[in-house]
Regions:
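C-terminal, charge/polar-rich interaction regions
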Residues: 166, 185-188, 195
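A short interface-forming secondary-structure element
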Residues: 172-189
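Mid-to-C-terminal catalytic subdomains of enzymes
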Residues: 104, 108, 114-158, 162-167
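Generic alpha-helical secondary structure
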Residues: 60, 144-151, 189-193
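A short, flexible beta-alpha/helix-coil linker loop
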Residues: 39, 138-140, 182-184
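C-terminal boundary motif of the adenylate-forming
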Residues: 162-171, 211-215
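ATP-dependent adenylation/nucleotidyltransferase module used to activate substrates
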Residues: 1-119, 160, 175, 191-206, ...
Length: 217
């Protein structure tokens, strides 16, 4: 049986935990839920350029300390070929801990993984990319629970309006909204953006702008 390890903390969107539970059941995996405390990691909270490296290393070291791995099991990571061409400091931690990356090793791209997932009737085949909420905080601005909660609330507001794959990036008390390129026209409609902006400001933000480039999923 395949065992899935999931690090649970405030850094993941609330719906992510439900998705993990559902997906592991669907695939017949045994799920290990590991609670982590990233706000106690000083190098993570400092939010320097190496934040992801320290976070990833802490998480995988915690996984590898589990008796399941001490007995000889191998830890696999979901890195794909597209990730290798991006700035991902966490990949250094993966390498240092000898975590295996089979999808990247065989050269699978994100698109190819989606196609194969669809062939195998996996419900996640068209799932929008998700990432740690800490990535939304401007570099070198300390990461706090309050900021992470604010990001989560803002993104939930957008999702309730039907926008998927959103990112709300914070810099001090200002927010930049990034939606999928196909959704830009809808969000740029004055009544829609005005309503969302008012919702954001009611949460304590002072400025709200839209990323005019949008984002690819």
């Amino acid at each position: 049986m395949v065992h899935a390890f999931h690090a649970r903390s405030e850094l993941l969107p609330p719906l992510e935990a439900e998705r993990v539970d559902r997906t592991t059941q669907e695939c017949g995996c045994f799920l290990h839920l590991i609670e982590i405390a990233p706000f106690s990691w000083h190098k993570f909270v400092a939010n320097g350029a190496d934040r992801c490296y320290h976070c990833k290393k802490k998480i995988y070291q915690t996984f590898l300390a589990d008796p399941f791995f001490i007995k000889g099991a191998v830890l696999f990571d979901g890195t794909n070929r597209d990730d290798l061409g991006q700035d991902r400091p966490g990949l250094l931690a993966v390498s240092e801990l000898n975590v295996q990356t089979p999808l990247a090793d065989v050269g699978f791209t994100k698109k190819e993984i989606r196609l194969l997932s669809r062939e195998f009737s996996l419900s996640t085949w068209d799932l929008h990319a998700s990432s740690c909420l800490a990535t939304r905080i401007a570099p070198r601005e300390p990461i706090t629970r309050e900021k992470i909660l604010l990001v989560s609330q803002c993104e939930a507001l957008l999702q309730k309006r039907g926008f998927k794959g959103v990112r709300v990036r914070l810099s001090e008390e200002n927010a930049t909204i990034a939606v999928l390129q196909k959704d830009l026209c809808e969000l740029q409609k004055k009544p829609v953006f005005s309503d969302i902006k008012n919702g954001f400001m009611s949460l304590g933000l002072r400025g709200v702008v839209l990323d005019p480039q949008g984002r690819l999923d």
